[in-house]
């Protein structure tokens, strides 16, 4: 799983920057920005790793002796550490702009090691700083930038923005048989739009979204002039992939879910978002079709979905009416999924440390 990083400026962002000389070279100049420590703790808990990156003009020269810098800086680091804030690394450019070095922000020399790592989640990593050069650094790194300001984008605002859940995924799957576009919003309800060309299948997919408590949009163009096989199978593959992507690092999810009855049917569903695809399925139908959906494709749909989503899924139904039996499977799955994707904390629900 790729890692989220926050590359954070020091003066003017973590601590106040003296307007007189822009140097924190005495203990009485050291002052933390409002709310910085609790918000950094919140961000760490949400899975971000912290890296401090700062330009310190002329550090080690007569105008800014190293000893004058070290005292306040070391105290700052001790306070952060004592409160549980851990920086993976502190990156410092000591040069003046006139030196034309290759490590001064917004140049990327200091962060080249992170850029070389395939493990960095660039879509969810940020540079946070109070200057235009910090935003330029973010652009040069190919990640997001947040310009800190006490009034317009302060630490509580940043903490809220970066920890607010809005799990989303967009998957496009094109083959010779089907063209499929799936969007999933796990933290929004209502407004689902589904068009696969198979009316009863659309109704069943809507049951997953409705009872799962999330929104999805699915558009499919398939070779229905042959039959519904490729349409149903490939929709399952695309939807499973979208759900997996939307779940992200899975921190805080319940992971497990189970549900039982519907009408005269007894539908059993047990789900584990385990990362290990497996399906146990038991359902018998009187007819080959319900509406325009082939009943033999129902198992195929759930098998395809469980494979790309990476879940262990047990589904079973008994009843008298084929329509109700089919619907009970989709409703039970949706309701079970609702339990499993619900966020209750910040930790990964696995003793192995990975899902």
Curated annotation (Swiss-Prot):
Keyword Hydrolase on entry: yes
Binding residues annotated for Mg(2+), in chain numbering: 9, 11, 130
Active site: 9 (nucleophile), 11 (proton donor)
GO CC annotation terms, alphabetical: cytoplasm
Binding of Zn(2+), residues: 93, 95, 101, 103
Imidazoleglycerol-phosphate dehydratase as annotated region, ranges: 167-355
Primary localization class, coarse: cytoplasm
Pathway as given in its UniProt record: Amino-acid biosynthesis; L-histidine biosynthesis; L-histidine from 5-phospho-alpha-D-ribose 1-diphosphate: step 6/9; Amino-acid biosynthesis; L-histidine biosynthesis; L-histidine from 5-phospho-alpha-D-ribose 1-diphosphate: step 8/9
Gene3D superfamilies in the record: HAD superfamily/HAD-like, Imidazole glycerol phosphate dehydratase, domain 1
Cellular compartment(s): Cytoplasm
Record-level Gene Ontology MF annotations: histidinol-phosphatase activity; imidazoleglycerol-phosphate dehydratase activity; metal ion binding
Listed name of the protein: Histidine biosynthesis bifunctional protein HisB
Lineage: Bacteria, Pseudomonadati, Pseudomonadota, Gammaproteobacteria, Enterobacterales
């Amino acid at each position: 799983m790729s890692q989220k990083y926050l590359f954070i400026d020091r003066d003017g962002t973590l601590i106040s920057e003296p307007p007189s000389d822009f140097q924190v070279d005495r203990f009485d100049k050291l002052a933390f920005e409002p709310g910085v420590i609790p918000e950094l703790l919140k961000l760490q808990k949400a899975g971000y790793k912290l890296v401090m990156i700062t330009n310190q003009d002329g550090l080690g020269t007569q105008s800014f002796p190293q000893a004058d810098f070290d005292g306040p800086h070391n105290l700052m680091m001790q306070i952060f550490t004592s409160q549980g804030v851990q920086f993976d690394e502190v990156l410092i450019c000591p040069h003046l702009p006139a030196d034309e070095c290759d490590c001064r922000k917004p140049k990327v020399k200091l962060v080249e090691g992170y850029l070389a790592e395939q493990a960095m989640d660039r879509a969810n990593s940020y540079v946070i700083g109070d200057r235009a050069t910090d935003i330029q650094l973010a652009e040069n790194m190919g990640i997001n930038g947040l310009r800190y300001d006490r009034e317009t984008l302060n630490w509580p605002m940043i903490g809220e923005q970066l920890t607010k859940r809005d799990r989303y995924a967009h998957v496009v799957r094109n083959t010779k048989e089907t063209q499929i576009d799936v969007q999933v919003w796990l933290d929004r309800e209502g407004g689902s739009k589904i068009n696969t060309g198979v009316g009863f299948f659309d109704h069943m997919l809507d049951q997953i979204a409705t009872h799962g408590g999330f929104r999805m949009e699915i558009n499919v163009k398939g070779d229905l002039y042959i039959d519904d096989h490729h349409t149903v199978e490939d929709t399952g593959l695309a939807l499973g992939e979208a759900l997996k992507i939307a779940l992200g690092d899975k921190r805080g999810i319940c992971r497990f879910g189970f549900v039982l009855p519907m009408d005269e049917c007894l539908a059993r569903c047990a789900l584990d978002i385990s990362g290990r695809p497996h399906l146990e399925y038991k359902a018998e139908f009187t007819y080959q079709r319900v509406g325009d959906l082939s009943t033999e494709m129902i198992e195929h749909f759930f098998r395809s979905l469980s494979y790309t989503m990476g879940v262990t899924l047990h589904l079973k139904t008994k009843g008298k009416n084929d329509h109700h039996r089919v619907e009970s499977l989709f409703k039970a799955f949706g309701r079970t999924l609702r339990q499993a994707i619900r966020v209750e904390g910040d930790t990964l629900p696995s003793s192995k440390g990975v899902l």
